[in-house]
């Protein structure tokens, strides 16, 4: 069963809390991040979002999707039937095709946005039937491309904590 989360208003948009923290809904489009007055001082975030894929993709892609995307390699990007022949670590197999002889998966993480958000000390807020869970964004990325996210959890939003002093950042 698939359920659309598109209509959940709290998962869209960018706002500033009374504490000064910036909240970015997981369904906020990357183009919205680059055009936001609230995020104007976050130069590295704006630059990273503006470099993701093409303008057409940035108009559809969300910040939540970008930070939670799968790691990829040439092997993993093949058809399901082809990958089943001799699975890699990520698919329960015993090898990494990206780097032969590696004892673990070394597929590359593709997000441009996640490293920038981690540099700001961002937190990820997940929701499920059990409630809400807030964790440092950096802590959700585990070995072999896995993420510390339960199957019933949905990324609700990201929080950039209020910074003391002048914020200076860059992304190239």
Question: Where in the sequence are the language-model features?
Answer:
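C-terminal structural segment of proteins
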Residues: 1-172
